[in-house]
Regions:
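Catalytic-core environment of secreted peptidases
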Residues: 12-32, 38-43, 51-57, 61, ...
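His/Asp/Glu-rich mid-to-C-terminal helical/loop segments that flank catalytic regions of hydrolases
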Residues: 279, 398-450, 569-570, 574, ...
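Charged, amphipathic alpha-helical linkers/stalks
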Residues: 411-505
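Soluble metallo-hydrolase cores and metallopeptidase-like ectodomains found primarily
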Residues: 3-5, 89-123, 176-254, 264-276
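Active-site-adjacent substrate-binding region
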Residues: 222, 328-448
Length: 678
């Protein structure tokens, strides 16, 4: 360990970070449950407190970067009802980002609607009533679908009970998520324990009178602030970013109080140790990560996306790495993990090999995973041209048990894990600061494209797969050649620094600054060309979603030719978002399709343009379902329709392969400039 790393470790005070994490619970919108939500008074006051804290620990250039968003203030939601024995239950409920105001207690009729699908409403009049639904957002569908289904049928609001997937730690657990829908379709969350006595009455009586007192307010076009502080470096135009979000559901101890505290704990120790960075270190507490815009599929990570895309677009090409933090004071598995972009995989693997103080709670050591996923702010950073990473937080059971519930508290705080992450990520900051050039391996992304290639499949579709294979091979080799030069430059740079030859190190750094800008430009171009999403927010390459669709279509056609409509439906279920055509009204399906395909890019935020194609199979699914119920085996119209869909998807696949060839050539053009600069 170098001397500066030792001084940093000696100056760490994890108790300070723990106290700060607890202090973040101070401001809340709901006096009983917590919540520190986008644009709310609680978020604004917390932002002010964090700005003061940044000043107090010695960060410089502290500022509040304003962003425009939709705000949400959830004050309370309390449900009151009698059980079968006449006992009165008064239940605290969670809420989603929607409007609902009762102005005191208001009486409603409540109705049970099973899983909240269209079929559950048959024979029911729910106009003006509260509907109770049991949902599993992990294994079935997001809250937005049953909520909008309730709205379409005229319900006053939907009350969701988590049947599984989230909040599994205890039957008293509430849950909160981004709504992914409009503010005018109200929704609340009720625990399984509180719901069960009411459900018993509803199943017996069909309808029950309940009382509700609620205040949940969404306000469009509001403001909040990302809070920024710096440790100025010798290079003002080269930066390393540390980020964490300060909005939360409930008390949000792990998600994301400890992450903000980790970030500032690292900053505090760096300042106290007297560390003088070469690059400017930027610490950014992001607002509105959990939610920040109404009626958008991509309604989270608002603060981070705006920070990179709107507020500071000039950061692109200057920030060499974003170290983002999520839920860092808990062990999420037998191995710790860092999830990063493909291009930083090699560098991170080399870095974690040097970590020799991994806690016993991680018997399998540290894994490096890639690429980044959509669940956290690092995705918004990456697609904006800032190579990013996050401590892995999705691998363990915490997501199913405690995440986004009132059980995310310090009962599950692990001081050893928290301390380890302070040491590890502080060292990582210093490692990035000791580089002549960003260690971007552009060859790795082309290797990933080749890893998922299927030349036989592309040939069967008359797509230029062989040419893509050739071009990505050339690009991979070009990227690897440049990366070898980068690694050698960084090795020499570190050696010069270790030997105290600062002037020579500076000369080497200056030689590589222009090349580093080109590396970052190539990284951004690769993100633009190759990062796409499916309808379930999984990250993939442009051609992969259509290829999957074509495989399912081929199977569906074969099933119909064999006379099995039921098996064909199983195949169609997997295509794009058509699984929702099986369970919800056409109006619901169309709303959540159109708001992806036909909405202004700014309202889609980081998801804009990431879904390239869509096949609407609602009518086809409805027809096949009806024939399955009637026992009809004449599928001639459906076969003809499916063959048209197959032809359409085939054309999309050919276009996607061609697009990737052009994208590969564009990235290569940038990389060639580096190779030619000897």
């Amino acid at each position: 360990m170098r001397e500066e790393e030792k001084r940093f470790a000696e100056c760490l005070d994890v108790e300070y970070s723990y106290r700060l994490a607890k202090k973040l619970e101070q401001y809340k919108t709901n006096p009983y449950l917590g919540y520190r939500t986008a644009g709310s008074a609680a978020e604004l006051l917390t932002g002010d407190m964090l700005a003061e804290e940044m000043e107090r620990i010695g960060l410089r250039n502290v500022r509040k970067d304003q962003l425009r968003l939709d705000s949400w203030d959830f004050h309370h939601a309390i449900l009151r009802y009698q059980d079968r024995e006449g006992n009165v239950h008064e239940c605290q409920m969670g809420a989603y980002q929607t409007n609902f105001h009762t102005d005191g207690w208001q009486t409603f009729s409540a109705v049970y609607v099973g899983k909240g699908t269209a079929k559950e409403y048959e024979g029911l009049d729910v106009s003006g009533k509260l509907v109770i639904a049991q949902i599993n957002q992990r294994d079935e569908w997001w809250i937005s679908y049953p909520v909008y289904q309730a709205y379409v049928r005229g319900a006053a609001a939907l009350i969701a009970v988590q049947e599984g997937g989230f909040g599994e730690i205890d039957d008293s657990a509430l849950n909160a998520q981004d709504i992914g829908g409009p503010e005018y379709a109200p929704a609340f969350s009720l625990s399984r324990a509180d719901a069960e006595p009411l459900k018993e009455r509803l199943l017996q009586e069909g309808q029950v009178q309940v009382e509700l007192s609620a205040c949940s307010s969404v306000k469009k076009d509001s403001v909040s602030y990302n809070i920024v502080g710096e440790i100025p470096g010798r290079e003002e135009d080269s930066m390393i970013l540390l980020s964490a979000h300060y909005d939360s559901y409930f008390s949000g101890f792990q998600d994301d109080n400890t992450a903000v505290a980790l970030m500032l704990g690292i900053g505090r120790a760096l300042v106290k140790s007297g560390y003088r960075p070469r690059k400017t270190l930027v610490f950014c507490a992001m607002a509105a990560e959990e939610w920040g815009i109404t009626d958008s599929k991509y309604d989270w990570s608002t603060g981070a996306w705006q920070q990179a895309a709107k507020i500071h677009p000039e950061w692109q090409g200057k920030v060499t790495a974003d170290l983002n933090f999520e839920l860092p004071a808990h062990a999420h598995g037998d191995a710790d993990g860092v999830r990063t972009v493909y291009e930083y995989e090699d560098f991170m693997k080399a870095f974690v090999k040097e970590i020799d103080d991994v806690p016993a709670v991680y018997p399998e050591g540290i894994r490096v995973l890639c690429p980044v996923e959509t669940m956290s702010d690092d995705f918004s950073m990456a697609i904006s041209g800032i190579p990013s990473m996050v401590n892995d937080f999705t691998s363990g059971q915490f997501m199913e048990t405690h995440y986004h519930s009132q059980f995310d508290n310090d009962d599950f705080y692990d001081a050893d894990v928290f301390a380890f992450h302070h040491r590890m990520y502080g060292r990582l900051v210093m490692a990035f600061d000791r580089l002549a050039a960003a260690p971007l391996d552009l060859g790795r992304v082309f290797q990933a494209i080749r890893d998922c290639a299927d030349l036989e499949f592309s040939a069967s579709k008359n797509a230029p797969g062989e040419l893509l294979w050739q071009k990505t091979g050339e690009a991979m080799e070009l990227g690897k050649r440049i990366y070898r030069r980068v690694k050698e430059a960084n090795r020499c740079y570190c050696a010069l620094l270790d030997e105290g030859r600062e002037e020579e190190a500076l000369q080497l750094r200056n030689m590589w600054k222009g090349r580093e800008r080109l590396l970052l430009e190539a990284f951004r171009k690769a993100q633009d060309c190759f990062v796409r999403l499916d309808w379930h927010d999984q990250v993939l390459f442009p051609h992969q979603a259509v290829r999957q669709n074509l495989c399912h279509l081929e199977k569906a056609i074969a099933c119909l030719e064999e006379g099995s409509g039921e098996r064909a439906l199983e195949c169609l279920y997997e295509i794009d978002n058509n699984r929702y055509a099986f369970e919800f009204d056409r109006e619901v399906f169309d709303h959540f399709t159109d708001y992806v395909m036909n909405q202004e890019p700014d309202r889609l935020q980081w998801g804009a343009g990431r879904i390239m194609h869509h096949e609407n199979l609602f009518a086809l699914v409805s027809s096949l379902k009806k024939k399955a119920e009637e026992g009809c085996r004449d599928f001639s119209p459906e076969l003809a329709a499916l063959r048209e869909v197959e032809a359409s998807q085939n054309a999309c696949y050919v276009d996607d392969i061609s697009y990737m060839i052009h994208g590969t050539e564009k990235v290569m053009q940038i990389l060639m400039k580096i190779e030619e600069d000897k």
